[in-house]
């Protein structure tokens, strides 16, 4: 998609801070390597060294559209917010799965169980996805922060662009033809409920809310000419600004012109005939009947309204691709010279490589038992080799780069271990396991008197539970983080730890990437000498990094021998620590605690409690309310209020809060249904 005409504004970082510590050297070397044409570059950035800011300054140096990949939605949202603050005049977009809930279509042959696709789409995230693709086809100063969603099938960018509608003032456009065009690209006419992806008509005035906007476009006709174009507020109708030209992109990524659609229908019919003949020849009459009914229904929907449920399963025909070929993805919307940055690459790279087989194993059953045509197999994520072919130059960022990244870069990497704050890596103390719990309690009490927090990591769930009980008996405020706690509760637990509602967090795997806890001054690793996944070199370095954001950060490893993994982690931490101390001494830097970040968190909590629209504590308060004694009208009002709050939270990218509110709403609706069933409603 390099031949599309895009506006060409410059990337510009706007920040009160200048690159500091290792950042200037890292930015310069990364820029030099990319400018020399090196395809794969690794940034080995220690925890808390400002890798996100380095990425922003690198983008400013390179002046190229950039894809930034993160391992999950939460980290992607965090990165997008950071980059928006650093690049306020450029388009920083967010592209992740738009499902709040997703149950994929599946068939379990052993029990003859068909599971229909079931999902709940987050309207705001879908809007952000459309905004990402529309920005990529309109301008060059675009950064898209994405999860692995970017390797899943999407409509082709050429069809998406070709089916867009360009409006210009004084241009001759027949109003009724324009309305038909809007319907063709999946906009719905709704003169009452005016929402995203709809349009309304009042005489010679047509209002549209594009799929990627929060504002509406007003088109005023004078006869068959466009008299004026405005952006307006969708609720009040107030004019925001007048413009001379507007491009309206389709309301779905899966669009095709009439000729392409007609050809796709014929291709699907031809494939259906061949597949039915094959199934009948093999005596699979039930499967053949099942496939005929489903496909003919889908074809009728496509012919009548240009769309059907699960249309993505026919994407190969809609795109005009040969069998077995890779689908179009978000990567195809970028210009050819785009840059890719993979954050937490030691997690993200294996994710990319594993998506194809997981998807394929489910779909093979659907095809074999007559639920889908074989072409549905081509609606899939990219294979690793296909991903490699589509991305150009790539920067891998991680505190512990994986073997693949290091091999791809020839074993070379750019190092960023000096923190702008002057904080150094924690000291590591190896102690014997004999009497380790009493020693740990002594260390915890020393920290709690200074209002500092402690993380304790164990090897088994049973050990974590027993340790938590024992610490509670000894008067220590402690919580236990385990696999039964969902993501939202986990975020709440960590927030409570930061705010000092308790002092010690015990868990099995506390090394999760992006765990930012500046108040933690001690990380205790029990059974550090038991080799395995949880005590590998990478795991130990990640766990040690949790104490690297505190001035007095310390790590205690309880072990009776020093394993190879321990030795490497200790040596690497000591090497970084010596380098950091020498730098601080040379430049007269006194390590500063991250007080500002803590204040920001406290401020956000206080603000959210004060706001009536989205208080972070609402979900907790509601769950404690005795809703069974609440009048039905009041309960319905509460559900409506929480739904509004959920929408507000999602628009502000506060997905943890939105998810918590969603769960509360589901519980309240269940309560309401119970009342209706017994005649209280």
UniProtKB/Swiss-Prot annotation:
Residues 636-671 form the UVR domain. ATP binds at residues 45-52. Residues 436-602 form the Helicase C-terminal domain. One of its GO terms (molecular function) is ATP binding. Keywords: ATP-binding, Cytoplasm, DNA damage, DNA excision, DNA repair, Excision nuclease, Nucleotide-binding, SOS response. Pfam families: Helicase_C, ResIII, UVR, UvrB, UvrB_inter. A motif (Beta-hairpin) lies at residues 98-121. GO terms for cellular component: cytoplasm; excinuclease repair complex. Residues 607-616 have a biased composition (Polar residues). GO terms for biological process: nucleotide-excision repair; SOS response. The keyword ATP-binding applies. It is found in: Cytoplasm. Residues 32-419 form the Helicase ATP-binding domain. Residues 607-626 are annotated as: Disordered. It comes from the Bacteria. NCBIfam families: PRK05298.1 (NF003673), uvrb (TIGR00631). The UvrABC repair system catalyzes the recognition and processing of DNA lesions. A damage recognition complex composed of 2 UvrA and 2 UvrB subunits scans DNA for abnormalities. Upon binding of the UvrA(2)B(2) complex to a putative damaged site, the DNA wraps around one UvrB monomer. DNA wrap is dependent on ATP binding by UvrB and probably causes local melting of the DNA helix, facilitating insertion of UvrB beta-hairpin between the DNA strands. Then UvrB probes one DNA strand for the presence of a lesion. The beta-hairpin motif is involved in DNA binding. Forms a heterotetramer with UvrA during the search for lesions. Interacts with UvrC in an incision complex. Belongs to the UvrB family. This is UvrABC system protein B. It comes from Corynebacterium diphtheriae (strain ATCC 700971 / NCTC 13129 / Biotype gravis). The lineage of its organism: Bacteria, Bacillati, Actinomycetota, Actinomycetes, Mycobacteriales.
